[in-house]
Amino acid sequence: MTIKTLALQCRDAAQVVSQLSAQAKHALLEAMAAALETDAAAILAANARDLEAARAKGTGSAMLDRLALDDKRMAGIAAALREVAQLPDPVGQITRQEVRPNGIRVQKMRVPLGVIAMIYEARPNVTADAAALCIKAGNGVILRGGSEAIHSNTAIARALQGALREANVPEAALTLVEDLRRETMLELLQLNDIVDLAIPRGGEGLIRFVAEHARVPVIKHYKGVCHLFVDASADLALALRLLIDGKATRPAACNSLETLLVHADIAERFLPLAAQALRERKVELRGDAATRAVLPEIAPASDDDYAAEFLDLILAIRVVPDLDTALAHIRQHGSDHTEVIATQDADNAERFVQALRSAVVMVNASSRFSDGGELGLGAEIGISTTRLHSYGPMGLEALTVERFVVRGEGQVRH
């Protein structure tokens, strides 16, 4: 079956999903969560095959962590689907209304986008998360995962499709692309008359390929080169907590810190504290000349290090003379994802917030809060770094659009 045929079937199924009631979607998502629990053993066995193949290829620890499933993570995925089930249904919400002088009633109403192509790497949980969010928002979803997770993704998709069948919803509403050739993905990205939106999540190469070749609208979930700037006025204990949480708790996450910027006035006090805490957590440090003047034992940082999304226990450090230099560094090397300032200076905090165009800006809070669940969205399909209708963590509302609904009593314009 061609990718175009699969997409057409998904579009037809999406029409069915778009008309499901909030109660029906709630029940469907609960059933999808139960299906994952029922099929957990088969899913974990499939994941073990993917992990074995990945280790044989010499895959790094960060990627293995993204790929791996266990009982705890499976329970978390099922729980996440139940959380999505409990979220308010955005479809049909009226976001604005007014009665015009001629008596017509003008409303803006949320409606599903249609068919969403999710293109991603490594993370099998995205298969379930994306399916749940898209269906809750009334959409069909085409899932194109990476070859490294093909067995896991297939097992998860089969379980979820079983729940769709039981609910008399066409299983094409959740379509998994099993042909992983690059040409097939390219063909999918050309189907702008069928697919309404493509969301790539993964490495820089994948996202660039999708952005450069798609005729379908694309919301990029670009790499997370996230910074922490420790200002001269910062509470050093607070800054250290932000640094440890942002770098050492889950370095493979896109909201983990990759670069530390330290004001020169506090470098000699803060850097030794930071180095000791990070060494205890096996973090490799790389710094500029000013950093190495305080920490001579660490490796020098290259220009490439400051633009890198390490996704590992590696941190680039630079000492800066002032806030303006920190802002300039972030603008040059950042990826518009998440930036953090540790400061007790309210004016500097406000300047930091206003001067950066990043999707999420934190003041005295960990970069790890750059997450849909943590920010009150309930769940996210990813973190958009594209300045379109959704910027930053994308929840259910980002998977809908607003259209005008006009109600009248026979009014005409002329």
Curated annotation (Swiss-Prot):
<dbReference type="GO" id="GO:0055129">
    <property type="term" value="P:L-proline biosynthetic process"/>
</dbReference>
<dbReference type="GO" id="GO:0005737">
    <property type="term" value="C:cytoplasm"/>
</dbReference>
<dbReference type="InterPro" id="IPR015590">
    <property type="entry name" value="Aldehyde_DH_dom"/>
</dbReference>
<dbReference type="GO" id="GO:0004350">
    <property type="term" value="F:glutamate-5-semialdehyde dehydrogenase activity"/>
</dbReference>
<dbReference type="InterPro" id="IPR016161">
    <property type="entry name" value="Ald_DH/histidinol_DH"/>
</dbReference>
<keyword id="KW-0963">Cytoplasm</keyword>
<keyword id="KW-0560">Oxidoreductase</keyword>
<keyword id="KW-0641">Proline biosynthesis</keyword>
<dbReference type="InterPro" id="IPR016162">
    <property type="entry name" value="Ald_DH_N"/>
</dbReference>
<dbReference type="InterPro" id="IPR020593">
    <property type="entry name" value="G-glutamylP_reductase_CS"/>
</dbReference>
<keyword id="KW-0028">Amino-acid biosynthesis</keyword>
<comment type="similarity">
    <text>Belongs to the gamma-glutamyl phosphate reductase family.</text>
</comment>
<comment type="function">
    <text>Catalyzes the NADPH-dependent reduction of L-glutamate 5-phosphate into L-glutamate 5-semialdehyde and phosphate. The product spontaneously undergoes cyclization to form 1-pyrroline-5-carboxylate.</text>
</comment>
<dbReference type="InterPro" id="IPR000965">
    <property type="entry name" value="GPR_dom"/>
</dbReference>
<dbReference type="InterPro" id="IPR012134">
    <property type="entry name" value="Glu-5-SA_DH"/>
</dbReference>
<dbReference type="Pfam" id="PF00171">
    <property type="entry name" value="Aldedh"/>
</dbReference>
<protein>
    <recommendedName>
        <fullName>Gamma-glutamyl phosphate reductase</fullName>
        <ecNumber>1.2.1.41</ecNumber>
    </recommendedName>
</protein>
<dbReference type="GO" id="GO:0050661">
    <property type="term" value="F:NADP binding"/>
</dbReference>
<keyword id="KW-0521">NADP</keyword>
<dbReference type="InterPro" id="IPR016163">
    <property type="entry name" value="Ald_DH_C"/>
</dbReference>
<comment type="pathway">
    <text>Amino-acid biosynthesis; L-proline biosynthesis; L-glutamate 5-semialdehyde from L-glutamate: step 2/2.</text>
</comment>
